Amino acid sequence: MSLKGPKAFQRFMDSQLVQEILESKPIRKRIIKTYSFGNFRGFVIDLPNEWLIKIRRSPFVSQVVPNFSFKAFDEETALSEVYRGRTIVARGENGGSPELHGFKKDECRGDSVYFDKFEASGKDMPQVNGKLLSRYIKTQSEAPRHLARLSRRSQLPYDFNDPTRYESDFNYYYYGWHQGRSVNAYVLDSGVMIDHCDFEGRAYYGADFIRSGNSGDQNGHGTHVAGLIGSKTYGVSKKVNIIDVKVLDSVGSGTLDTVMSGLEFVSNHCNYKGKQGKPVWGSEDSHDDDVESKRCVINLSLGTFRSTIINEAIEELIKQGIVVVVAAGNSNMNACWTSPASVADVITVGAFDDRIDSIAKFSNWGNCVDIFAPGVLVKSLSNKFPYYPIEQTGTSMATPIVTGLVALLLDSGIKPTQIKKRLNELATDNIFPRRTLLFKPGTPNRIAFNGVKRDDDDYHHYSYPNITIEHILKELDSYNPSNYKRSTLSLTLV
């Protein structure tokens, strides 16, 4: 139940309606949980149907909704639609270690997998006399595909017959300063494996609203998402602080209550605590009313059909200066029919297939989508095999890529209210073939770009991909929209 304004709760409790209910049984004992952040007020209450009918008519009540359940997106279904690459096989025969095929082992030892160097000259050269300049270009060699695409205007090659062919050929170019050190990125998900070495000690426990007794990430979705935001090897923002806010259990299920509790935690943590009990957006005496000075971003790789209560809660966080990045959804429909993607001031992210530079066939679309990022077979961290990456597919993967980019922009001093505008200014336009947008009205033809244009000489002057029409037709034939589960009473990780 949500209420109309910060004073509505007491007025509601003092109303004649509640007094009549109190004669039957004390209503306060039926209130399970209350929410209060900014001007948003709400609570979870256990009431019989006859009381709910009366309460809905109260002038102090905005809306009453069931504490409906939500679940993790079926990753296996998504992969069955698009997967044409490598597989992971966990054998573990005779008690031995699992054998994983097709991926390079990342032992978190730095240069064995992650190559990092800076290239600078002239005014961009960092100084050694204490006067460090704000921009110089660093290079991550043998970078994962999604990072290479983020720092490139043109298409990357892909060989459908040999997916590993170009695996070690790409670079990720980024500015060395402003890598998110002053920013908190809140991951509302299934938990995060915060002690994974690729987070370099920058991942912190925030809150657990599942309270199952199982700490960390027992599902894997949250760790994969967090890795795309800010891990050393797969993350966009190399120094951002990852805050684990667990709202899903080991099978990827939760309730509206857990999500709302997570949003309330972020509001309080960003406004009053920040990293290690101090504000992360300035001096220790920074005030929570200083909206434009905050450096907090939320990643929500989840959604539901359009819901006013969720939208109102998200809108309140945005008013507080918190940037909210959400997934468009995986149902191949108009994202404006969903929440929180339909909130005007969130950053809604769709997925594109960077193998063919086209909107991913599962991605939601429409004018509520702000930008697209790679979302097909995206490589990131695993919660089960900490020294091997895994590939996952969905707008859940595209969203944290943009969240990482938002962290870079916040760290560079761009105000929260200007982040979406800056993302669109940097973006690469007119990538998707126009014919693919004919039946997706209002969809932006725009993909995320980090602003560092450094083309790989070996590939820049070629057109990709070099594939046969038979291969595309075979993949299209396997597409079955009915495999995507939809429910008006479910929030779904995407």
Residue ranges, per PLM feature:
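Extracellular S/T/G-rich loop segment that most often corresponds to the catalytic His/Ser-adjacent loop
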Residues: 183-184, 189, 322, 337-414, ...
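Subtilisin-like serine protease catalytic core
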Residues: 142-143, 160, 170-205, 212-264, ...
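C-terminal subdomain of the subtilisin-like protease fold in secreted/lumenal serine endopeptidases
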Residues: 34, 240, 244, 264-302, ...
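Short, surface-exposed ligand-recognition loops at beta-strand->loop->(often short) alpha-helix junctions
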Residues: 1-12
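Helix N-cap motif at beta-to-alpha junctions
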Residues: 46-52
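Protease zymogen maturation seam
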Residues: 26-34, 38-40, 57-183, 438-484, ...
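Gly/Ser-rich catalytic serine loop of serine hydrolases
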Residues: 212-223, 329-333, 389-402
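Active-site-proximal beta-strand/loop segments in catalytic clefts of secreted hydrolases
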Residues: 3-4, 47, 66-69, 153, ...
